[in-house]
Amino acid sequence: FFDDKIFNLMDFDCDQKDSVHFFYTLPFSKTKALIETTWISDLNDNSLKDYDKQLKNYIESKLKIKNYKINFKETGAIPLFHPKNIKKLNQMEIGTAGNMTRLSTGYTFLNIQEQSRYIRENIESITKTKIFSLDKKYQFLDNIFLKVLKNNPKKMAQIFYKMFNCPSNTVINFLSNKSSIYEDISIISKMPKWIFLKQLF
């Protein structure tokens, strides 16, 4: 069924419905994998929510697997905005509520680990400690990205493709908030310039 040494991170070869749609295929072995259908879209659009049908079509038509069993299913939604984070006495928001989600990707897990480490190291003075936040550089870049996404949904597959054409370590560092200025420039230089520049104004 699967090549357990290769994962498919974003497969855009599927119906976009004037939005942004892709599949993940993450094999655990040659016979087991996590397959996910993902939409970046308006939650009010119920036409996008026939997830079971989407997965069935993808598994049978794209992956060419006819005899299979789904052992576990889950659904989720990641908000592509940061809630207002107000520090309260003896209380600190964590995870998505604590603005740990990268708005350009939805990635949160590594940021939660960094935030948890920060809280642990400052637990004795947590009421006097400033709120842990993502680097403002990434917040700025993500906000531009979201504007591009909103105004150019049909171009997003091409944009993601260009980004992932960068060296893998560069992409991983960028997505993990660890990129140097040179790595940032490397990724930005691959992007369609005019589309992004228009979002600055």
Show where each model-derived region lies.
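Conserved FAD-binding catalytic core of PHBH/FMO-like flavoproteins
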Residues: 1-46
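Low-complexity, flexible helical/coil segments
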Residues: 2-10, 71-76, 106-108, 127-133
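General secondary-structure edge motif
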Residues: 5, 35, 99, 136-143
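Internal, well-ordered alpha-helical segments in soluble enzyme and binding-protein domains
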Residues: 6-9, 21, 51, 55, ...
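FAD/FMN-dependent oxidoreductases across multiple families
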Residues: 15-19, 39-118
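Short amphipathic alpha-helical segments, especially helix-boundary/capping motifs
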Residues: 29-33, 77, 90-94, 132-137
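C-terminal helical "tail/cap" subdomain of flavin- and related membrane-associated enzymes
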Residues: 117-201
